[in-house]
Amino acid sequence: MAEINKPAFKKPDLKKMTPKGERKANRRGAARLAAVQALYQMDIGGAGINETFAEFESFWIGNEVEGEQYLPAEAAFFRDIVAGVVREQKQIDPLIDDLLARGWPLARIDAILRAVMRAGAYELEHRKDIPARVVVSEYVDVAHAFVEKDETGMVNAVLDQIARRFRAEEFSKG
């Protein structure tokens, strides 16, 4: 059995996330949460992508862990986000870095917030099938499960700027 209290796993407060019904959007929200946790684990613990996929898909997603019930997630969507961030990270990190306040490089930001912003940036740039406002809102919601409101404001500001850069047409519709 996998060890539950891995130091590289950051437990979310699922009660802070917006409750949603059992529907496709909810399964995508669960995939986003799992992707952020997986990216965090890979960043902090140095785990490889295949090992991380195997662990999350068999142990975390859709299971009860430490008294918390994790929702079933859309596995293909989870894999796309994680693999996409890993593949595009050399382009994503400078993009985020440029949008952060002077003196606050991405490397200085908490690892869980790095994971949230990387995943959101990936979706905004590469998943044009999902409305930008939905992506920003979902990742702000994921951030709420881990950090205080001040920090979610930073996530919102950075992802909103990325959305307007890559999806300007969605914001000019009124």
From Swiss-Prot:
Swiss-Prot/TrEMBL GO biological process terms: DNA-templated transcription termination; transcription antitermination
Gene Ontology terms, MF aspect: RNA binding
The keyword Repressor is assigned to this record: no
Superkingdom of the organism of origin: Bacteria
Similarity annotation: Belongs to the NusB family.
Organism of origin: Rhodopseudomonas palustris (strain TIE-1)
Protein name: Transcription antitermination protein NusB
GO CC, one annotated term: cytosol
Function: Involved in transcription antitermination. Required for transcription of ribosomal RNA (rRNA) genes. Binds specifically to the boxA antiterminator sequence of the ribosomal RNA (rrn) operons.
Matching InterPro entries: NusB-like_sf, NusB_fam, NusB_RsmB_TIM44
Signal peptide span: none
Family annotation (Gene3D superfamilies): NusB-like
The keyword Nucleotidyltransferase is annotated on this UniProt entry: no
Record keywords, A-Z: RNA-binding, Transcription, Transcription antitermination, Transcription regulation
